[in-house]
Amino acid sequence: MQTLPKERRYETLSYLPPLTDVQIEKQVQYILSQGYIPAVEFNEVSEPTELYWTLWKLPLFGAKTSREVLAEVQSCRSQYPGHYIRVVGFDNIKQCQILSFIVHKPSRY
């Protein structure tokens, strides 16, 4: 059984090895298939007390494929390599965030 080095945990998916781009695409495909609006956010720290993350551009209202969202994730990664980056699924009917997961952690962690 493979165990990961002891590190800080942020969410359910953080107990798994880092997600590959293919795995991120599958998660984003789920967001799109449920009719949620994907968005990309970033922040310098990932503390439970940090309620507000900076939005990368606008939410991707017109995104039809997971490739479009993944391209934005990769752009954000290249612009902010020392920040945490997460993908968010927003339900515009309930007006709330339904899910989010971290897709990039700074190299210091």
Swiss-Prot record:
SMART domains: RuBisCO_small (SM00961). GO terms for biological process: photorespiration; reductive pentose-phosphate cycle. It comes from the Bacteria. It is found in: Carboxysome. The keyword Protein transport does not apply. Induction: Part of the rbcL-rbcS operon, transcribed in light and constitutively during growth on fructose. Transmembrane segments: none annotated. One of its GO terms (cellular component) is carboxysome. Keywords: Bacterial microcompartment, Calvin cycle, Carbon dioxide fixation, Carboxysome, Photorespiration, Photosynthesis. Coiled coil: none annotated. It holds the Pfam family RuBisCO_small. GO terms for molecular function: ribulose-bisphosphate carboxylase activity. The keyword RNA-binding does not apply. RuBisCO folding and assembly commences when the nascent large subunit folds with the help of chaperonin GroEL-GroES. Both RbcX and Raf1 help folded RbcL release from the chaperonin and dimerize; dimeric Raf1 binds to RbcL(2) leading to an RbcL8-Raf1(8) complex. RbcS displaces Raf1, resulting in holoenzyme formation. Belongs to the RuBisCO small chain family. Heterohexadecamer of 8 large and 8 small subunits. Forms complexes of many stoichiometries with Raf1 and RbcL. PANTHER family: RIBULOSE BISPHOSPHATE CARBOXYLASE SMALL CHAIN 1, CHLOROPLASTIC. RuBisCO catalyzes two reactions: the carboxylation of D-ribulose 1,5-bisphosphate, the primary event in carbon dioxide fixation, as well as the oxidative fragmentation of the pentose substrate in the photorespiration process. Both reactions occur simultaneously and in competition at the same active site. Although the small subunit is not catalytic it is essential for maximal activity. This is Ribulose bisphosphate carboxylase small subunit. It comes from Nostoc sp. (strain PCC 7120 / SAG 25.82 / UTEX 2576).
